[in-house]
Regions:
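Class I S-adenosyl-L-methionine-dependent methyltransferase catalytic core
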Residues: 1-189
Length: 189
C-alpha cells in the first residue's frame, strides 16, 4: 500500500459506537472462501470488525493466525477496540467486512499502517465517486475481485423477516504492498 496520506473528506460525521454497532451484518462463508482462492496472505491477519467471528473462523480453519477485534463486545475476539483510533497494526495483514458507512475510513486507516495486504469486502458500487477515486489512487488499490453472482443476503443480526438473496453486487478490494501499476480487475464465481 502507498505510504501517501489519505486525504479523503469524511463522508459524514464519525458514527458513535452505538450507531456503528447497528451496521453489523455477518459475512457469508462463501465470500471468505472465494478470497482465499485468489489471494495468499503471508503471516497473521487482523480482523478489526470481527463480529461473531465469521471471517476469523474461516481464516483459522485455513491455518491462518488471526487477531480478532471489534468496536462492540460480541463475545468473540477482543471487544471495545476502535480500529479507527488504533495507532499501529496488530498483524501484517488486514481482512474485514467494514461497516458500509465507514468503509472509506477503514481503507484510509489501514493504508496508514502500510500492511503487507488489506482486503475489504464492500459493495461493488463503492468503486464509484470522485473522492473515492482519489482515495484509491493515493492508497494504491491493487485488485478488485468482483463476485459474478450475488452473495447470500447479509441480514442484520436479529433480523426476523424473510430470508432472501441480495440484490447488491459485492467485491473484495485488495491493497498489496508489493503491487505496482494500475489496479487489476478479476471475477470470482
Amino acid at each position: 500500500m502507498s505510504e501517501a496520506r489519505c486525504h479523503l473528506p469524511m463522508l459524514g460525521a464519525r458514527a458513535a459506537g452505538s450507531l456503528r454497532g447497528d451496521d453489523f451484518h455477518e459475512t457469508p462463508r462463501v465470500a471468505i472462501e472465494a478470497l482465499l482462492k485468489v489471494e495468499d496472505f503471508d503471516g497473521p491477519v487482523w480482523e478489526p470488525a470481527c463480529g461473531y467471528g465469521a471471517i476469523s473462523k474461516v481464516l483459522e480453519a485455513h491455518g491462518i493466525p488471526v487477531v480478532s477485534t471489534d468496536l462492540v463486545e460480541r463475545g468473540y475476539g477482543q471487544g471495545r477496540i476502535d480500529f479507527l483510533m488504533e495507532m499501529g497494526p496488530r498483524a501484517p495483514n488486514i481482512i474485514t467486512n467494514p461497516p458500509f458507512k465507514l468503509a472509506a475510513e477503514f481503507a484510509c486507516k489501514a493504508a496508514s499502517f502500510s500492511p503487507a495486504k488489506v482486503a475489504l469486502l464492500c459493495r461493488l458500487g463503492w468503486l464509484e465517486g470522485k473522492s473515492r477515486r482519489l482515495m484509491f489512487m493515493r492508497t494504491g488499490l491493487a485488485r478488485v475481485w468482483v463476485f459474478s453472482g450475488r452473495l447470500p443476503m447479509m441480514h442484520r443480526v436479529g433480523w426476523a423477516g424473510k430470508e432472501s438473496t441480495s440484490a447488491i453486487a459485492f467485491a473484495w478490494f485488495v491493497w498489496d504492498r508489493d503491487h505496482y501499476g494500475p489496479p487489476e480487475l478479476g471475477w470470482l464465481p
